[in-house]
Amino acid sequence: MVLLMRGRVVRGGTLVGAAVLGLWAGPAGAAPTLPGQLTNGLQPVKECNKCHAFANSPETADQPLVTPVAWQASMMGSSARDPVFWAGVAIASQDAPGETAQCVRCHAPRAFVGGRDDAIAIEELLPDDLSGVDCELCHRLIEDAETPAGDARYAIDDVLGLDGDVPKRGPWDYQVGDPPKHGFAFDTYIGESRMCGTCHDVSTGQMRVDAGGSSLGVPFGEQRTYSEWLGSDFAKQGPEFKSCQDCHMPAVADVAGCAELESQGERHASGGRRHDLAGANRRMVELLKQVYGDAGEQAVPDVFFDVALGSIDRSLAAAATLEVSAPAEVDLGVGLTELAVKVTNNTGHKLPTGYSEGRVMWLEVIGRYGEQVVYSSGRWIDGQGLEGDLQQRTYEARAVEHASQVAFHLLRNNTWLVDSRIPPKGLKQGLETDPVGDRYALLADQTWPNFDAVSYGFPGTSVVDATPEDAGDDVMMLSVRLLYVMNTPEYVQFLADENAVNDAGQAVAELFAGLGPVVPLELAAWSQAVPLRGLMVPAPGSSSGEAGSESVGPTTGEGVGSSSGGGPASSSGGETTAASAGAETGQTGDGGGG
């Protein structure tokens, strides 16, 4: 690979090396970096902060803060601080002593390359290790074409540049304008999805087996986010192409590269990228803000956590689309029928994706008369989790150890009981990324659908008219929401109960308890008021409420939004709202349903 490189070094405010323009071949024979191999250690993040922390320009002051150091509050920047990670590592160390180095390799790269890869608790790390997946790791990564992506087998540049420093690698070549005050190398690899795949395909030491216990000849894929993208339409060059960075590091126009140029009003003509690296783990970011933010250890400013939370909200808002076809009216004597729901995955990977333990997405369907819930499926019960009704529609991947059928033990898992997560558009067949179970059917082009369609039906019931003298409020409010929870109460309790090594699991349980009840993330929502017929009139002298023997007959008011005819009303447009922060069974499906 021949790259264009310019570098200069400033020490003590004096320019000691002029800008150098030349051809730079880069390191040869790249291979995964192992503990103790680096001659030139990773520079601490605080050094990067000196130049790369700056406010938005006056023209963009009303936009989310774009400084790259806001990365610190992302889950990438918090990967080594994540208390759920360390609680899981402790249990993994019980299950497979000596095999947790790969966990540290991904979540705490500085600890790994520094020889602290045997750590099983956050207390065993050095302060600089806590910066997680940080500036120097990404900006010194070099492409290793021989090693397959995955399992954090990163190759870190350790070759000094012309200025006596290991160059920082990035997509700007500085043929025009002021170059940075550190060595740099123009390298497009940092903008490719394969770089993200370094850590976002993960296998364990177990071999995967099928439902009968027979080996499938491949390692157990704990997560395959990169492979999901690679097999989707998003990875194909063309109008639908999107890299990981396009979604998780959105482009911004007219941005400075450092604080000095920002203060001088200089901008980089080709713009830059946000470094928010947004995912969906909002509750964890809230927890980390309490522990490490301004009111806690003051390791990361609250303003950066606020940037991270806002970025998560925007990411969730674009993740999925709901389409609902509802009946024109509901007759309580007949029940709620013909409620059809379609969920479309707009992301470039399964929805949800990544680490699957303790994570579930589902549909909540509610039919209310006033404040009374008449029909429901997928209700979340505080402190317990999902109610578990027969029509509950979930999207999750559940793994177990085949021999014992024990769940949640990451390094013992070797088979998938189910993987009902929604595939990305155009996902090709492949053992490593196929759904597990009978939820989805291949489309005509032999790809998996990026949607799930399901129909709900509820039987007739009796409800007393709260205002028999007023037919204007004889209305049922129908609502459908796509909800998501990471770290379910069941999983958090598992982390606390199963840990015999240290108190990391109990600490996690206490931290989450301090946040209060779990509020599921809302990825998409739909609602519509329809006329309600068949309400029971209370007998004279009785109070309103559930119908009983004293009710004397139905009322037939039209209600708000009434319409004639009994056919379904398509309601997939204006009332579908985007995300706000804050069982495998189902009825009939079509296309992607089942």
Segments (PLM) and residue ranges:
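Bacterial N-terminal signal peptides that target proteins for export
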Residues: 2-16
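Cleavable N-terminal signal peptides
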Residues: 16-18, 28
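Ser/Thr-rich, Pro/Gly/Ala-heavy low-complexity intrinsically disordered linkers and tails
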Residues: 28-30, 536-594
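N-terminal module-boundary/linker segments of secreted carbohydrate-active enzymes
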Residues: 30-61
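Primarily the internal scaffold of c-type cytochrome electron-transfer domains
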Residues: 31-32, 55-89, 119-450, 454-468, ...
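Residues immediately within or flanking Cys/His clusters that coordinate Zn2+
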Residues: 41-46, 96, 100, 132, ...
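Conserved, well-structured interaction surfaces
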Residues: 100, 105-117
